[in-house]
Amino acid sequence: VRIMPHREKGEGHFAAEFVKEEETGKINIGCPQSADKETEKIYRAFERENLNVRLDGRFVSFGENLYLAPQNVPDLRGIKCLRPGIFLGEIRKGRLVPAHHLCMCLKAEDFKRTASLTEDELCAYRRGESVFRACENGFGAALYGGRYPVGWFKSSGGQLKNHYPKYLRG
C-alpha cells in the first residue's frame, strides 16, 4: 500500500508490522480476583428480586465492588484494568447496592419495578430528590418516556428514594 502524504488528507500516517514470535497456545482465562460463591449468591438474590433477566458471565470482585466480565476474559494479573466488565454494584452488609452502570446497560422490560417519570419528576429526580408514587417495595428503574432507564430508585412506603449518582446530579 502506498500512501502519498500530499494526496491524502490527514496530519500524519503510521504503519506497523507485527511479527508473532511464538505460538501462545491456549489463553489462560483464570482471573485472580474471581468473586467467591457467597458474593455470587448475593447478586443472584438481588437479580431474582429486582430483574426479569439473568446476566451470565464471570463474576469479578475488587474489594467490595462486583463486576460481571465476559466468560473469556484473559488473566488480569499485572494489568491495570479500569473496569473488567459491567459494574454490578457494591456489596454492603450482605446485600448488593446496585451500580448506575448496571441500570444503564439494561432495557426497561428487564426491570421488575419501573416508574415512568414526567418532565417535572425527572428534573427533581436528576437533582437528587425523592419522587412520591405507589410502587412495590424494592429497587427499580426510573424511566424517561416510559422506555429509557435513567437510574435506580428504591421504593419504600409510596416513596421512590433516589439512587441517582451524586456525580451526575445537577
Predicted regions and their residues:
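Core SAM-dependent methyltransferase catalytic element
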Residues: 1-30
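Polybasic, low-complexity RNA-engagement segments
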Residues: 21-170
